[in-house]
Structures are given as structure tokens and as C-alpha cells.
Curated annotation (Swiss-Prot):
GO terms for molecular function: tRNA (guanine(26)-N2)-dimethyltransferase activity; tRNA binding. This is tRNA (guanine(26)-N(2))-dimethyltransferase. Residues 1-334 form the Trm1 methyltransferase domain. Its EC number is 2.1.1.216. Belongs to the class I-like SAM-binding methyltransferase superfamily. Trm1 family. It comes from the Archaea. Keywords: Methyltransferase, RNA-binding, S-adenosyl-L-methionine, Transferase, tRNA processing, tRNA-binding. The lineage of its organism: Archaea, Methanobacteriati, Thermoplasmatota, Thermoplasmata, Thermoplasmatales. Gene3D superfamilies: N2,N2-dimethylguanosine tRNA methyltransferase, C-terminal domain, Vaccinia Virus protein VP39. Signal peptide: none annotated.
Amino acid sequence: MIVREGSAEILVPEVYHGPGKRGTGFYNADQKINRDITIEFIKKMGIRNVLDGFGGTGIRGIRISKETDSAVTISEVSPDSYRLIRDNVERNGSQASVINDSFECVLQHGAYEYVDVDPYGSPVPYLDAALMGVKRNGFLGVTATDQSALTGSVPHKTRIRYDALIKNDTFRHEMGIRLLIGYMAKRAASLGRFIDPLISIWHGHYYRVFVRVRKGFEGAGRMMQNLGYVNKHNLLSGIYQDMDEGPVWKGNLQDNAVAEAVLASAGHKAFNPEENRLLFCDLTDIARARHTSLPDIESVIDALSSSGHAASRTMFSPTGIKTDASCDLVESLMMDTLHRRSPA
């Protein structure tokens, strides 16, 4: 089957949607926005050489080689997938080099300005090699599809893989991304490195984060101050369980200037400067706890803005509001909104 994406035309054994599966070079159509954003990120940051560490069909590396000025290496451990990538590189007249070896072995032979980690499942086994294989002040792009562990929906996986406790509730996807970044930060610190999150996205079945990697134990020490525990009971009493979750990343999820430029160029609508705030107020949770109906979310956001507060929707919940106001005030304004719309 022939698939066209961006400037590439590749041969694939099958087209797949969803979290992916093991197999020779399957093409995941749901990851197109992931690849679009990656290409715009590479352009924006002026990256000159790239390792696509998990080649699959070769679509990511081929698109990068054709749509940016970067030199590209594609690595793939599967011999069958390697042959498929090599054929697709030739089909596209791409200058990408293709290596039939493991991700870790490729990184032992040289460092890259940008390393892309997009494996089947969890990125955890590959993070140390990736962090060590990035050049000074280089970049990592990491995809995680192991949401059952990151969101706490399978608690023993969360404990074993990420050494953390996460409650599977309304906040699970924000906590999942913060757990992923926090784990990356811990691994970086252990290697004398530190990271700065530049873009963080939840898109369906996967999380995608881009970070800058720097060296130095002093910087690592400062970075580790962003790790800690979250107790949602403090958001709004009487709704959320009194328990400490984490450790997770409590710092910024993105560099607003980088995220805005990259996501706009990629045609992605998710940029929101308020996403850096830790957690949000969820109107569905409040309505359920107070046994009332759900108001129009935009009316509550308008009321917050009129009160002088920053407020916006969040990618993590269709009824969540990121704001500098307390959730107590959000609840009060929500009730006012409901009363105003009620018939006299």
C-alpha cells in the first residue's frame, strides 16, 4: 500500500490507527500531527542533525530529510523494517542514512543535536541512552503510549515503571504528562544533565514532549526543585481525596514562545499559555459534587476574566479551566452563572 504524507510517499504493509502494535513497519496514521509538529520544531530550533531512533516505515526520518535542512540518520533494529525503510528512502530520493542496529548501539557511535524517541510502548528503557546521546544544549522528542501506567489506571505498572502513585481521575492526563517529564528529569539528573520542557502535548493515545538537554549537576539540582507531590484535596475541599500523588513535574510544561510558534506552523490548535499552571478546576467534578447542572464553560471563563483573572480551557479536560483564581471562586462564579440562567 502506498501512503502519502507531507512531501513523502512510502510503501507500507498496513495503515494503522490507535496506540500501535508490534510488527514490521506499520504506519500509524494517528501520529501524523506528531510528525508535523516534530518537523516544525526542528525548523524552529535550527537543528542540523537528527537521529530518528525507531524508524518503523521511515516516514518520520524521510519527511525530516525532505522538509528540513537537517542531516538525518534512521535506526531500526528489525531487519525486515530496515529493508522497508531503505526501500522507502530510495523511493523518495532522500539523503537519510539508514542503520540496522539498536537505538542504544547507534548512540554509542556519535551524538546528535536532536534525538527522537518514539518506541512501541514506554520510552523508559531508552531514556538514559537518549539523554547521553544528545549533544550539549541539544533536544529530545519523546513519545509515550503507555498511558495505563502514566495515568494510574493500572497502579502496579505506575509503581514498577515510574516509581510513583497517580490516581486515575479527571486529572489523569495532566498528571500523566507531568509524571513522564518528572521521570525524564530524574534520569537526567542521575546522569549530570537537566532538561527544560519546551512543548508538551496529549493527543489521543499518546503524550509527546520536547525538551532541551543541558549538562551540569548544579543545573540538575535546580531542576529537581520542580519535582514534588500533588494533593488535589487542596484544590477544593470535599471533592478530591486527601492523598499525595507523584512525584511529578510541577514546573512549566512548555516554553510559551517556542510552543506557540511551532504549534501554529504545524496547524495545531492546542497552544494555550495557561497550560503551564499546575492543574485546573473542572466544572463537571464541581457539578457532580454539588448535585447541580453543568453551566456553559465559556460563561464561567468570561466571568473569571471580568473579575480580573486569567482563565482558559485546557487540553486535559473538556470542562476544565486553567486559571489563577481559586477553585472556590470558580465554584462561586459557576453557581452565579447557573442562577442567572434559571427561570424566575
